[in-house]
């Protein structure tokens, strides 16, 4: 039997007030090998903001429902599905469709949330922490004694990169708003203001860093490359083009700066390199790494901070508040009133 499903739809690119609309449509029963899940919390990331603006790489055209990931409870199993009993808490990466009360999703993409893990914390793991884990452990291969620099160190992915790099024994530097510096220092990082460029000279005086994690893009890529150490293997790990979100500048195409950065890999004589990092749920590393993060959360090895919990009805305000306000961690959207 079909059920009514309230969801957000991006009807056109633009500001939250006009781009985001609530609609209610019938959701059919889950098809073969699918599971219907009642969504409790949806993750909220820069990708959602950039999709609303129409600048996310290779995104769908409107109309579509945003929401990159979720934590929820199994409602109904479709034919051929039975791995999860109804009522089981699960999480998944979806890219679309998580800003909705219910979702039909292939069973193979669901992971059970371990006992003791808060669902809203689990909702932050598939995007923010999975991205960070892959960048730290596979893209940059951060190890003990290395120096790491993170743009936006107090942001959702930035703080995850910080904690995971500290666990590896690295020394962590990065840019952040001054209001977050005390918390970052307490966590073990060395923050700099993002409103000036003092960090460039400071990192060069240290002999450069082994890894830079850059979600800003454009001119920031050149600055990041300039602070890499030339003496050992070092890398810029680029994972976004969010500079305009911070500065309010006119939107530009990110493709030329991205190509320019990756072109530097042709300098075969150099120890410096560059990677543009992204995740998909079909990568063979995605499921085991997300499972590891769920287990690390359960075991208290990591404690992913939640910056804000927005009510579903207030999702437009969540978009307006992106990159604003104090605090560290991942914002999430409470979809279910009884979550």
Swiss-Prot record:
Kindly provide the name given to this protein in its UniProt entry.
Protein indc11
InterPro entries associated with the record: ADH-like_C, ADH-like_N, GroES-like_sf, NAD(P)-bd_dom_sf, PKS_ER, Zn-ADH-like_protein
Q: Name one GO molecular function term.
A: oxidoreductase activity
Q: What induces it?
A: During mycoparasitism.
- Domain of life of the native organism: Eukaryota
Pfam families reported in the protein's UniProt record: ADH_N, ADH_zinc_N
Would you tell me the Gene Ontology cellular component terms?
Answer: mitochondrion
């Amino acid at each position: 039997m079909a059920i009514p499903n309230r969801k957000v739809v991006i009807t056109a690119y633009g500001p939250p007030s006009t781009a985001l609309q609530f609609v209610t449509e019938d959701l059919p029963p889950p098809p073969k090998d699918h599971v219907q899940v009642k969504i409790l919390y949806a993750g909220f990331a820069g990708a959602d903001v950039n999709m609303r603006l129409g600048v996310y790489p290779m995104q769908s055209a409107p109309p579509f429902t945003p929401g990159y990931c979720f934590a929820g409870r199994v409602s109904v199993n479709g034919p051929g599905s039975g791995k999860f009993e109804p009522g089981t808490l699960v999480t998944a990466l979806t890219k679309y469709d998580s800003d909705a009360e219910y979702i039909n999703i292939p069973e193979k993409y669901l992971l059970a949330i371990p006992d003791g893990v808060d669902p809203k914390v689990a909702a932050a793991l598939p995007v923010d922490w999975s991205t960070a884990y892959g960048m730290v452990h596979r893209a940059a291969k951060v190890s003990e004694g290395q120096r790491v620099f993170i743009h936006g160190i107090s942001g959702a992915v930035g703080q995850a990169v910080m904690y995971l790099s500290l666990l590896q024994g690295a020394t962590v530097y990065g840019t952040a708003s001054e209001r977050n510096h005390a918390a970052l220092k307490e966590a073990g990082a060395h923050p700099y203001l993002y409103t000036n460029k003092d960090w460039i000279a400071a990192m060069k005086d240290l002999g450069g860093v082994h890894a830079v994690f850059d979600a800003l893009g454009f001119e920031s890529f050149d600055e990041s490359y300039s602070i890499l150490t030339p003496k050992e293997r070092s890398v810029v790990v680029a994972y976004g083009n969010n500079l305009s979100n911070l500065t309010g500048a006119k939107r530009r195409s990110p493709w030329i700066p991205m190509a320019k950065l990756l072109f530097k890999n042709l300098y075969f004589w150099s120890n410096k390199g560059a990677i543009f990092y992204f995740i998909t749920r079909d990568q063979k590393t995605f499921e085991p790494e997300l499972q590891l993060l769920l287990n690390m959360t359960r075991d208290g090895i990591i404690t992913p901070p939640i910056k804000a919990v927005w009510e579903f009805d207030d999702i437009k305000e969540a978009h307006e508040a992106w990159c604003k306000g104090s605090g560290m961690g991942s914002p999430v959207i409470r979809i279910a009133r009884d979550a």
